[in-house]
Amino acid sequence: MITLLMLPFFLVLLAIFGIIYDLTTNKGRKECARTVSLFILNILTIGICLLDLPMESKPYSGTGFILFYALAYTPLIIVFSLYTLYRIGKHYRYFKSKFAITLLFNAILLFLLSLVNTFVLWRSFQMYHRNDMNLFYFILIVLGICSTIQLIVGELEMKRIRGIQKQEEQDGYEK
């Protein structure tokens, strides 16, 4: 039981070390539009939910999903959404475009939804209602949609930035 309770601390620590590594290796880069970690985390969580459906009539169905959701997904979504907000804020400082505005708005929405998710999880531990599971599903789906939008728009922004940088290189060679 103690090792199960240490899982969120280990995962958050691992995520923070990954973020620190990313920050130290990408110091000079200004383009930070694409975030894959939120998308992968949401796909993994939806996969675990589908493997262990809490709506089945078995006695302990959904326990694995609820434990993963409470102990791994919720702490990681806060860390990754905060890091995404930081990266997109840094990106927006250098590249102001419609894509960058969309990414910034979406990153703020992701962070606020992760805080709402934490509050709903805390409230469900205080007093459990059957509607809390439906709210978890709704938040998971909305976070999944937002992270997918973040991935797609971020990729489009990266292609736009690469085109701008390539054009600047060609202009530099001509001079």
Feature map (PLM): residue ranges:
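Hydrophobic alpha-helical transmembrane segments of integral membrane proteins
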Residues: L4-L5, L71-P75
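Hydrophobic transmembrane alpha-helical segments in integral membrane proteins
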Residues: M1-I16
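Alpha-helical transmembrane segments of integral membrane proteins, especially early/N-terminal helices
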Residues: I2-L4, T25-I43, L104-L109
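Interfacial non-cytosolic loop connecting adjacent transmembrane helices
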Residues: M1-I2, L51-A70, Y94-F95, L115-I141
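Cytosolic juxtamembrane helix at the C-terminal end of the final transmembrane segment
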Residues: I20-A33, T84-F99, S124-F125, S147-G172
